[in-house]
Amino acid sequence: MQKNIRNFSIIAHIDHGKSTLADRLLHLTGALSDREMKEQFLDKMELEREKGITIKLKPVRLNYRARDGQEYILNLIDTPGHVDFSYEVSRSLAACEGALLVVDASQGIEAQTLANVYMAMDLDLEIIGVVNKIDLPGAEPEVVKQEMENVLGLDQDEVLPISAKLGTGVEDVLEAIVERIPPPSGDKEAALKALIFDSYFDPYKGAISYIRVVEGELRQGDMIRMMSSGKEYEVDEIGVLSPYMTEVEVLSSGEVGYVAAGMKNVNDTRVGDTITGARRAAPEALSGYQEVKPMVYCGLYPLENSEFERLRDALDRLKLNDASLFYEPDNSDALGFGFRCGFLGLLHLEIVKERLEREYDLSLLATAPSVIYRVLLTDGSELMVQNPTHWPPPQKIDRVMEPYVKASIMVPNDYVGTIMELCQEKRGSFITMEYLTSHRVVINYRLPLAEILYDFFDALKSRTRGYASLDYEFHGFDTSDLIKLDIMLNGEVVDALSFIVHEDKAYYRARAIVNKLRKIIPRQMYEVAIQAAIGNRILARENIKAMRKDVLAKCYGGDITRKKKLLEKQKEGKKRMKQIGRVEVPKDAFMTVLDIEND
């Protein structure tokens, strides 16, 4: 049985046809009928279909009768292709013995694909090269095969040319999986060891874990233990996904399936944890797993303060499905109660926000995203600051360190100059440049993470007409000249608009934000002063003129002293209003801090 199992995943850049190939494999092996066949079957979230990307991994079991007449079980463990989700990719790959590397015949290898292939090579997976979209007019399968050999060392004669859309050559892919990917090793008789590579919450069954059994076997009614927490549960149901949930009696070593054990809390089924038997435990857990650290932080606040509890509940549920989401309650003078959340990257942030709004019907406001800074104080202590409102006063700061990333940018060589210019603007330092082919280059730069956050990706695409691709990895902390810029309305600091900026860019950003706010904040009954300040030093100021009621409308001609009296009275009223009045800041003003870069 075990020798006929093949566990594999698909590595591909966004839009290189991974989900289409997965659909085609489901169809060919009979897992889906013609009627059920719909685009991106494994991407269950509406959002995934809309954006055309894979966010959550869904494992699926395919039964395939090979040309040698034997029946094989193929477990496809789908992986997301976006750089934010590289930890999910690593978990997926750890559950496999092989991977299909899918590359678009008209685009060639992209930067993120490279990063994921290296991850698969580190895990010793068998890699099968596939060139997809050979039916396109601009396809150059031979050039791409040559590139795969030069860059990754795959034998170009073994790379399979296919068109997932038309189904050409997909049968050969299934044969290659059977022939070239090794069956799982692992002793069926040993103590149970199963790897959790994903989990989600079911309102009826509680937390459900997707697992790959590495050793031993798991049966219904068994008592299991989570190795990280030591908690024990009784197994209510186990099964496989083919592609719908199907109960089975036993899952043994090498198999992929799901387990429901009545866990009420998703934190009990941690992604990357090892499940073992409670009565006969494995001596040590499976290696290679770490707690994911968020890289990008932002505040999420409900538009109605009464929605705070609903937001908490929604975040608790999302956390169930998303091990990398971090959040803690936060309070802002301007925005009321909300949460400070941590994400893997900007796409992750956008997806979480959209899911909260769609699936839980919440109206949310997100503050400008920021990274985590390491602040060394004059008394020798150290602070990790991820919220600008917690920034210490300048006189207490010795130096500030910010996170850096190593970015690999792949571009056609016509655009090398513009890319280097962009990286210099973003405070980058050049590392290396290498030619993959005569017209494709990989440029490596070291950049501050904060500079990548805003619109680096958009600028990259627009300067290279969409040809560049980007991959980045965390590369330690480094000292920078950073300061906190406060925005004040009538002398009061609006905490939600504060942000951290590099000294060289402070004046430019201050000027731009003050101008933008002047256009967005509606006129009040009294004059409003908008100021940008660093400590006590004002960098920029704009005034919004007061709305003025014509108090002289009733005076026809007549006595000037009467008019003066009315005008003085109005002036007094405005003065009093200014003392007690609060400026209403429209919600979209908080995103202006973000949009400045684009103007």
Curated annotation (Swiss-Prot):
Its EC number is 3.6.5.n1. It is a peripheral membrane protein. It is an enzyme of class 3 (hydrolase). GO terms for cellular component: plasma membrane. It is found in: Cell membrane. It comes from the Bacteria. Gene3D superfamilies: 3.30.70.240, Elongation factor 4, C-terminal domain, Elongation Factor G (Translational Gtpase), domain 3, P-loop containing nucleotide triphosphate hydrolases, Translation factors. It catalyses: GTP + H2O = GDP + phosphate + H(+). GO terms for biological process: positive regulation of translation. GTP binds at residues 15-20, 132-135. Residues 3-185 form the tr-type G domain. Keywords: Cell membrane, GTP-binding, Hydrolase, Membrane, Nucleotide-binding, Protein biosynthesis. SMART domains: EFG_C. GO terms for molecular function: GTP binding; GTPase activity; ribosome binding; translation elongation factor activity. SUPFAM superfamilies: EF-G C-terminal domain-like, P-loop containing nucleoside triphosphate hydrolases, Translation proteins. Required for accurate and efficient protein synthesis under certain stress conditions. May act as a fidelity factor of the translation reaction, by catalyzing a one-codon backward translocation of tRNAs on improperly translocated ribosomes. Back-translocation proceeds from a post-translocation (POST) complex to a pre-translocation (PRE) complex, thus giving elongation factor G a second chance to translocate the tRNAs correctly. Binds to ribosomes in a GTP-dependent manner. Belongs to the TRAFAC class translation factor GTPase superfamily. Classic translation factor GTPase family. LepA subfamily. HAMAP family: LepA. This is Elongation factor 4. The gene is lepA.
